[in-house]
């Protein structure tokens, strides 16, 4: 009889694995098929965003935020613009606020659609992503009509948004909403109620609410464990106070609850979008989309060609940029992945002294070992999918 002790063996999951959600490398220590330890290796997409921002003006820094969570770009721009506006002490006009909320909810649907359908693909269902991508395509066309770009929109500006949306675009977004709710019902029937999907996700990746707070979780992760915590309700920003929507909350804190919550959040986002479309179409929703302060927001092209002062403002704004009063501020928004925060320190110049980005996915990924321990190897990709991680924001 062989007396050699049985030892654990280590395998690499990624960094080019199709279920790794980007450039993630996990070193898994296995005892047979049971996971004993998970060691996430990050940094393969590190671009030094926070340091690069210190050498550029505030306006030049906005596009960097599109490249963090590149699945829902405008939500990140929102946090950065809110932080700058807080330091400058300026208020965004009502129409600008409504447009921001509208595009942030479109970003939420873009993110959740990708996540829930690819989660189904990770556990073996190949049809949902095809249905989901069809709807995402329509939303990306809206992005393109508003900003000229399908993904890296660069649409939000300190003080408002870059340009107004034509009424036809607002109407088309409104017309998209109701048919999409039918697609949500179809997706629900297709895989949320599917018994194989349930077997692969129910009671997998369970985490208690207490542990959620300890690990610094936010967003869907804490709502899946039973906390009705949503920054849009808890600390309302822009015009979210006017919006009527519910916060879906789970009970068990497992993969399945998190996916059901994302499905319901898409319905709630559609509800908010319909309210925004209605308000934007009313007389009270008309008006400027950015603050009239030309030290921060450029004058219109027509004005610039007639007025010398407007030309000077434009020239100064795009050569030197605007100066932000010295101080420090933290602004968090309810991004699709969780609380996306920007801690901005200004030294009174035209460039940020320091900009610390709080990426929600970073805290979620750090708990991979805690969530996967004693799970089966096949459950690792299901747990990873339920965390909804994008490496643009984790590695920055």
Swiss-Prot record:
Q: Between which residues do disulfide bridges form?
A: none
Membrane topology field: Peripheral membrane protein
Q: List the InterPro entries hit by this protein, alphabetically.
A: NADH_Q_OxRdtase_suD, NADH_UbQ_OxRdtase_49kDa_CS, NDH1_su_D/H, NiFe-Hase_large
Q: What is its EC number?
A: 7.1.1.-
- If you read the UniProt record, what top EC class would you report for this enzyme, in one word? translocase
Identify the PROSITE patterns for this entry. Answer: COMPLEX1_49K
Give the reactions, separated by semicolons, that this protein catalyses: a quinone + NADH + 5 H(+)(in) = a quinol + NAD(+) + 4 H(+)(out)
Q: Which UniProt keywords apply?
A: Cell inner membrane, Cell membrane, Membrane, NAD, Quinone, Translocase, Transport, Ubiquinone
**Subcellular location field:** Cell inner membrane
- Which domain of life, per UniProt? Bacteria
Please provide, alphabetically and separated by semicolons, the GO molecular function terms listed in this UniProt record: NAD binding; NADH:ubiquinone reductase (non-electrogenic) activity; quinone binding
According to its UniProt record, which protein family does this protein belong to?
Answer: Belongs to the complex I 49 kDa subunit family.
Assembly description: NDH-1 is composed of 14 different subunits. Subunits NuoB, C, D, E, F, and G constitute the peripheral sector of the complex.
Listed name of the protein:
NADH-quinone oxidoreductase subunit D 1
Q: What is the lineage of its organism?
A: Bacteria, Pseudomonadati, Pseudomonadota, Alphaproteobacteria, Hyphomicrobiales
What is the gene name? nuoD1
